[in-house]
Amino acid sequence: MRIYLKSIEIALIASATLAGQSDISGERMRAHTRFLAHDLLEGRGVGERGGTLAEEYLAATLASFGVKPAGENGTYFQTVPMVGVTVDGQRSTMSAVKGDKQLALRWQHDYIGTTHTQLPEVPIDAEAVFVGHGIVSKTEKWDDYKGTDVRGKVVVLFTNEPQPENPQVFKGRTLTYAGRWVYKFEEAARQGAAGCIIIHTTPTAGYGWDVVRNSWGKEDPQMEFDPGRPALRFAGWVTEEAGGRLLSLSGHTVETLLKAADDPNFKSIPLGFRLRGQLVSSMRAIKSRNVLGRVEGSDPKGLTEAVLFSAHWDHLGKGIAVRNDAVYNGAIDNATGCAVVLEQARVWASLGQKPRRSALFAFWTAEESGLRGAEYFAAHPTIPAAKVAININYDALFPSARTRDAVVTGAERTTVWSMVQEAARRMELELSPDPRPEQGSFYRSDHFMLAKVGIPAFKVGLGTRVIGKPDDFSSKEYQDYNANRYHQPADEYRDDWDFASLEHAARFGFLLGLNIANATELPRWNPGDEFAVAGR
């Protein structure tokens, strides 16, 4: 009898899975994307009116689906306390001084940045020293700071990693966390530096100066100041041209120092000039919110555990006008991801036979400011981190015709990889490797913050082979987006978009999530993975 009843349960779950997948609608996702990317929401800025509208829309939509609140005090919200730091570029100054030579830098034209001290006036007067890529890695036996005391100094460096074309150094073209700009600032602070300046080049950053300027030239939402953590007085960037002028004061060029930074025997180079100036900033308290919903599972033992679907709701708000448009709508980044998770929440809530485990649906704030919302949830989870079975994250999906493949960045590092392969087979999808490993996408989206606390987490993305299009269609579309729309006002919704790709991606992730929700064991990181030490 038990076997018979179990067979009925399995059959019901399988039937529910098929029904749920077929009910996922690209046109519903179109409607969500269109609204979230509308000018009415003013670019969904953190702590701004448009951001609050986005939060309320997401919560109200979850409620309309019958998804229960999973935030604080019986609400759909988890408040993330932050401090908004806005640099006054007109009153701030920055110059390089060597003897009687002085090179003044212009805000946004030559340099841009912020302060992590959260003080309104921060004087800067420090010796500059070049530290290559600013990496300290025991596993890679690489230390750009070896033999150098940078306490109280400003370190100058490049983002990315040394020798990216050499597979024997770090992971070759596949960027690791040590190559990310946020790591550079963290390591500089750990070393006691007063400031950190990244010399921007498009090849090392992976995007142009306009992306840096548009992202950094406005309010910077930061986590509330922790006096126990080191804080940079200045953290920022200079253009390649301005960086070249700075380096010329000491007889160096961008090209020669990029080459020097690739040398395994690299040692830091005193640049012989001082950075002098003052950063003038205004501060305000920000109470932005993660939006969280829950659908409970059917098994009394399993419902305390949850599969977590996520996407970030924020974008850049209003900023520097480009062709008389100052609204950074963020249609692809990331109204599309929110649309996928909303549609998955709707269908999951409608299932007659719920899976064993519960499901959480999360919409993070402040991803564009350094994954702040996901970072806060990881530190203050609304359910114990050990009970989060998996995090399936969506970020920046390109609407198009269906693709023949999918990219699931990071899943191969977990015990659910075989389930990913099976779900792809059932969806008639091939699994492709990351087409742009040099971008380090695993470390650039919210799931990374959950991985850091040991939760198996990865991003589900669209593939590169679009049905009915030339083989290079996807790569050309990405190149155009990265050059002309990414973090620009041009990232807007279009009526001619085909949402078949998002529909298929949502069904794939839905199937995968259901299978994990019904699995006997909780997923784990593979033995030896960098995140296995943080959790299961």
Show where each model-derived region lies:
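Long, well-ordered, tryptophan-enriched scaffold segments
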Residues: Q108, R190-P203, Y207, S215-W216, ...
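Acidic/histidine-rich catalytic neighborhood of metal-dependent amide-processing enzymes
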Residues: R173-G179, E187, P203-T204, G317, ...
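N-terminal capping segment at the start of a domain
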Residues: D23-R49, F65, P69-G71, T239, ...
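Metal-dependent peptidase/peptidase-like ectodomains
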Residues: A104-H109, P120-E121, K146, M223-D226, ...
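His/Asp/Glu-rich mid-to-C-terminal helical/loop segments that flank catalytic regions of hydrolases
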Residues: R346, S350, G461-G535
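Acidic/His- and Gly-rich active-site-bordering loop/insert found
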Residues: L36, T239, K287-I320
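Extracellular/luminal Protease-associated
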Residues: D23, L105-F234, E296, L303, ...
